[in-house]
A protein has these predicted regions:
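Nucleic acid-binding interface residues in structured DNA/RNA-binding domains
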Residues: 2-5, 13-133
Length: 133
């Protein structure tokens, strides 16, 4: 049986720092790339203050800088942000209060590609953002 997003989020994974031997996703060969974890993305999102939003680009830049890297892997970042968002949605479906889940709508915009993949209407994301203005 496939793991739930909550199970994926709880898996202990180590961050990796990789020096690229060839260009990858806009990151140049020779640059140091951070490959984060679902927990790292979740922790970052939880720290975004009420009423504020962030872009994926800002998330990647800040995490790279904090970890002394040139860039953060955009592919794994998108996957791990999605895991964090899906775990929050699962928790709400099980009755968790919105105040107790990771506020993924602060990083995932209603028109983002990730939003289209989530099991929640993008209008809901739009409404959550509007409630925090």
């Amino acid at each position: 049986m496939a793991k739930t997003a909550t199970e994926k989020l709880r898996q202990n994974k180590a961050t990796k720092k990789v020096v690229l031997d060839k260009d990858f996703a806009g990151i140049k060969a020779g640059q140091r790339m951070l490959v984060g974890t679902p927990q790292m993305m979740d922790a970052y999102i939880r720290k975004i203050p009420f009423g504020e939003t962030r872009t994926m680009q800002r998330l990647r830049n800040e995490l790279a800088r904090r970890n002394k890297c040139d860039a953060t892997c955009p592919v794994s970042t998108a996957i791990f942000v999605r895991i964090s968002a899906e775990a929050a949605i699962e928790a709400m479906e099980l009755g968790a209060d919105i105040a107790d889940v990771t506020p993924f709508w602060r990083i995932v915009g209603p028109d983002d590609k990730i939003a289209a993949k989530l099991n929640i209407d993008s209008e809901w994301i739009r409404q959550q953002r509007a409630l925090e203005i």
